[in-house]
């Protein structure tokens, strides 16, 4: 479920558009424009043509371009800068709206600090890292921390949007609590883990607002490319001036500026920042908090996914699927014993056994009290559970691990049939878990527990395989069981009997081969691997150590979310690539629009290059400048929403991008510039 902070604002939302328009004007300040070298060149060109307009108004020059032409070009050049600013402001505005919603979650509370064996009430902002506070039912937790004593039900809907309460307890992987969440029951003692201003909510607000956003490596590389292209075209346009003078071509300063602006990659230059901001925004709407844009980008380049079996690939609860009686044992006898041994078992496995017996063998659950039964709980030492009956005659029914039940039967003087090992082996080979059932000295049979693979997960892995991403299942199961589940789920490889050290070693091995690795984790023992992975997604329900080690936090604590994180990263990279291709392809059409129009009068030989048949040199330049500005505003929705994600390999994606955005980037300007030329002629503006 999405959190309140993650609901996206519509692009046409007035509350978003009005501030964005104001911000786009504010961003005309040289300090803001200078952060984007491409748009700074456009800004400088706009300023230069503005000076030319004022100069022509004050002292008209006989050799100057028509004043109306210079004014129109100047206005559209300023619009180009404003549209680029508007794209960035809209992307930032969505983040500011989310930050506003997050700020509303902050509540000034009084904390019950535990110090020197007694409670004292202090304002929550006065708490420091290491302080301990007491929280009881109805209290708001005053700050981020770890439960060091007690267990409680906590409402985290203010942060995660999930209405169902969660359990937080000391000493495990569910000990982390977040400031602003509410204790619903019981009493806990919390050790504060963040100073004021460094809390989870503070970090969310800072990241959402973009205050902590840094350019990703791909953005830096793309900026270098765009700056290089801009310098090349700047030098080319500067050299045109002496060539034009030598050739006797009347080339105005306005035309040179217009040519430069149309040739440099203004489309991607104007949208680049908005694309990056929107990428982090899309991830946040999936309730995943990325600590940096670098992490989002790395997710798009991931080569290997390490996925925990439980909760990610399988449902996590083993379900009883069949009963296998031993020779000489009736199915009804095994079903009755399995049911009796499970009636007081509140685990998902125990409930599934009762349900299987009821639905398949039509045996209604019986009351243990009627048999004067005593429930025998499961322990790590015995590895079995069951019940002892008194009426109508004494019985000791047990179910549990096969080797534990075998030991129990033999201790009662019973014999173990050879068929037991064969049946257990078949279940293990199929990826299941066998539970043996005994009635005193008689071994009755086996219950087949199966870890159910999530629906649709295999198709999802097929999509990643098509993109060249390798999937590895991480499990504590034995190799035989792990291999069976891996086959059923469709993963490429598995790591059985996994330990934290084995996970870390696997990540380092993959990285040693030049691969980028992504994984999820929630426990303190996952922290080293999360820190080592290129993309480490920590669960919000996990420990503070895990959340600090990872570079993303999943507020929903859903391990499957890693797959969506990778898709968002891929979409971000695809959007960068496709719009860059489109922008550079645009320049080709604008080249054919402006250059022939400027020089065709002196050099008739280049007339065939005027493939658009534009009506006049002034109309050609003005049409290209108008198209150059309008295409930015038209592409803002695509920059914010992202290019549609398709699970294809790198070569297939490249071919598709070149065909759709490369060829399309050439054709669209030809059509657009010609249409604008016709319209300008129709209204008498050129």
From Swiss-Prot:
Region Disordered, residue ranges: 101-123
Top-level lineage group: Bacteria
Keyword ATP-binding (UniProt): yes
Enzyme Commission number(s): 7.2.2.6
Binding site for ATP: 345, 349, 378-385, 399
CDD domains in UniProt: P-type_ATPase_K (cd02078)
InterPro entries recorded: ATPase_P-typ_cyto_dom_N (IPR023299), ATPase_P-typ_P_site (IPR018303), ATPase_P-typ_TM_dom_sf (IPR023298), ATPase_P-typ_transduc_dom_A_sf (IPR008250), HAD-like_sf (IPR036412), HAD_sf (IPR023214), P-type_ATPase_bsu_IA (IPR006391), P_typ_ATPase (IPR001757)
Gene Ontology CC terms: plasma membrane
Compositionally biased residues, Basic and acidic residues: 107-123
MF-aspect GO terms: ATP binding; ATP hydrolysis activity; magnesium ion binding; P-type potassium transmembrane transporter activity
Function of the molecule: Part of the high-affinity ATP-driven potassium transport (or Kdp) system, which catalyzes the hydrolysis of ATP coupled with the electrogenic transport of potassium into the cytoplasm. This subunit is responsible for energy coupling to the transport system and for the release of the potassium ions to the cytoplasm.
NCBIfam families found in the cross-reference section: ATPase_P-type, kdpB
The name this protein goes by in its record: Potassium-transporting ATPase ATP-binding subunit
Organism listed in the record: Myxococcus xanthus
């Amino acid at each position: 479920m999405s959190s309140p902070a993650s609901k996206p604002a519509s692009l046409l939302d007035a509350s978003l558009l009005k501030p964005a328009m104001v911000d786009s004007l504010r961003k005309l300040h040289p300090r803001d424009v200078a952060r984007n070298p491409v748009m700074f060149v456009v800004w400088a060109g706009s300023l230069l043509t503005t000076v030319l307009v004022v100069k022509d108004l004050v002292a008209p020059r006989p050799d100057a371009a028509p004043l109306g032409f210079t004014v129109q070009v100047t206005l559209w050049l300023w619009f180009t800068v404003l549209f680029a600013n508007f794209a960035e402001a809209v992307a930032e505005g969505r983040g500011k709206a989310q930050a506003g919603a997050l700020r509303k979650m902050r509540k000034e509370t009084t904390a019950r600090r535990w110090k020197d064996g007694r409670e004292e009430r202090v304002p929550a902002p006065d708490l420091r890292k290491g302080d301990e506070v007491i929280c009881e039912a109805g209290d708001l937790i005053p700050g981020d921390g770890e439960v060091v004593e007690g267990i409680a039900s906590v409402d985290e809907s203010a942060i995660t949007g999930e209405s169902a309460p969660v359990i937080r307890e000391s000493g495990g992987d569910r000990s982390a609590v977040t400031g602003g969440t509410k204790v619903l029951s019981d009493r806990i003692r919390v050790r504060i883990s963040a100073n004021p201003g460094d809390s989870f909510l503070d970090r969310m607000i800072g990241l959402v607002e973009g205050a902590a956003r840094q350019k990703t490596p791909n953005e830096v590389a793309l900026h270098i490319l765009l700056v290089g292209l801009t310098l090349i075209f700047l030098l080319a346009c500067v050299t045109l001036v002496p060539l034009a003078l030598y050739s006797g071509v009347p080339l105005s300063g306005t035309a040179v500026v217009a040519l430069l602006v149309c040739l440099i990659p203004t489309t991607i230059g104007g949208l680049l920042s908005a694309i990056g901001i929107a990428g982090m925004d899309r991830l946040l709407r999936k309730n995943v908090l990325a600590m940096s844009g670098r992490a989002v980008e790395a997710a798009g380049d991931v080569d290997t996914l390490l996925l925990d079996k439980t909760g990610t690939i399988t449902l996590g609860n083993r379900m009883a699927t069949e009963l296998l009686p031993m020779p000489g044992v009736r199915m009804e006898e095994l079903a009755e014993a399995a049911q009796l041994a499970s009636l007081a078992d509140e685990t998902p496995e125990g409930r599934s056994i009762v349900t299987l017996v009821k639905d398949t063998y039509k045996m209604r659950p019986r009351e243990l009290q009627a048999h004067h039964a005593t429930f025998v709980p499961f322990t790590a030492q015995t590895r079995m559970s069951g019940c002892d009956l008194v009426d109508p005659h004494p019985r000791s029914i047990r179910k549990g691990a096969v080797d534990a039940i075998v030991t129990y039967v033999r201790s009662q003087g019973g014999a173990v049939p050879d068929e037991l090992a064969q049946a257990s082996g078949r279940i293990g080979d199929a990826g299941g878990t066998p539970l043996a059932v005994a009635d005193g000295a008689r071994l009755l049979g086996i219950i087949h527990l199966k870890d159910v693979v999530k629906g649709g997960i295999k198709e999802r892995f097929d999509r990643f395989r098509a993109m060249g991403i390798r999937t590895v299942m991480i499990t504590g199961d034995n190799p035989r069981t792990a291999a069976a589940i891996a086959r059923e789920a469709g993963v490429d490889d598995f790591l059985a009997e996994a330990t934290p050290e084995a996970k870390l070693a696997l990540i380092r091995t993959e990285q040693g081969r030049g691969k980028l690795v992504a994984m999820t984790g929630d426990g303190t023992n996952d922290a080293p691997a999360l820190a080592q992975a290129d993309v480490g997604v920590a669960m919000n329900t996990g420990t503070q150590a895990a959340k600090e080690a990872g570079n993303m936090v999943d507020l929903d604590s859903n391990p499957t979310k890693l797959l969506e994180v990778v898709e968002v990263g891929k979409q971000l990279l695809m959007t960068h690539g496709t719009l860059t291709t489109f922008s550079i392809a645009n320049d080709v059409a604008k080249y054919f629009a402006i250059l022939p129009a400027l020089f065709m009068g002196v050099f008739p030989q280049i007339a065939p290059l005027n493939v658009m048949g534009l009506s006049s040199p002034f109309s050609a330049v003005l049409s290209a400048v108008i198209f150059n500005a309008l295409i930015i505003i038209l592409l803002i929705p695509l920059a914010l929403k992202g290019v549609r994600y398709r699970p294809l390999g790198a070569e297939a994606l490249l071919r598709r991008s070149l065909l759709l955005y490369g060829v399309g980037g050439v054709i669209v300007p030809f059509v657009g510039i010609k249409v604008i030329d016709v319209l300008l002629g129709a209204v008498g503006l050129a």
